[in-house]
């Protein structure tokens, strides 16, 4: 009698079952990581806006503009547009900012969830550098 080498149907089904279970656990975890990576782009853009706001207030003093335009902050029209977030004037794209005081500087930058991002729905950056997420 010849001995056959290979896997039985049961062994192959067990392997497929194990791979399916691992995939069902790993995929939701990876989606959270993907959203987190996409938010990194928005946070980087918000950081640039925060720096521009501090410069704007330092240059203007008490004559600062509460909702400064892109050009007042030193940006061109497409400078705040990324892969996942649409830039533009405050409140037009995914970003909105407001300056409330010059001494000490007080402002907030709100980012709405961009293209293909599920959670959180928005993140706010305060002048203290604190990020607040809204689910």
Can you say where each PLM-predicted feature lies in the sequence?
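Aliphatic-rich helix starts adjacent to a transmembrane/signal segment
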Residues: 29-47, 60
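Functionally critical, cavity-lining and gating residues within the transmembrane helices
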Residues: 23, 39, 55
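N-terminal single-pass transmembrane signal-anchor helix
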Residues: 1-31
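Conserved catalytic core of two-component sensor histidine kinases
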Residues: 16, 43, 50
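Periplasmic/extracellular, small/polar-rich flexible segments of pilin-like filament-forming proteins
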Residues: 51-135
């Amino acid at each position: 009698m010849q001995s056959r080498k290979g896997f039985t149907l049961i062994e192959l089904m067990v392997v497929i079952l194990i791979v399916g279970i691992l995939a069902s656990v790993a995929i939701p975890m990876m989606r959270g990581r993907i959203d987190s990576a996409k938010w990194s782009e928005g946070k980087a853009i918000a950081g640039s806006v925060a720096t521009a706001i501090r410069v704007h207030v330092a240059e203007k003093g008490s004559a600062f503009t509460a909702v400064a335009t892109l050009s007042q902050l030193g940006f061109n029209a497409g400078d705040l547009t990324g892969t996942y977030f649409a830039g533009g004037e405050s409140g037009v794209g995914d970003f909105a900012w407001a300056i409330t005081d010059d001494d000490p500087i007080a402002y907030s930058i709100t980012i709405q969830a961009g293209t293909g991002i599920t959670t959180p729905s928005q993140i706010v950056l305060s002048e203290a550098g604190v990020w607040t997420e809204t689910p």
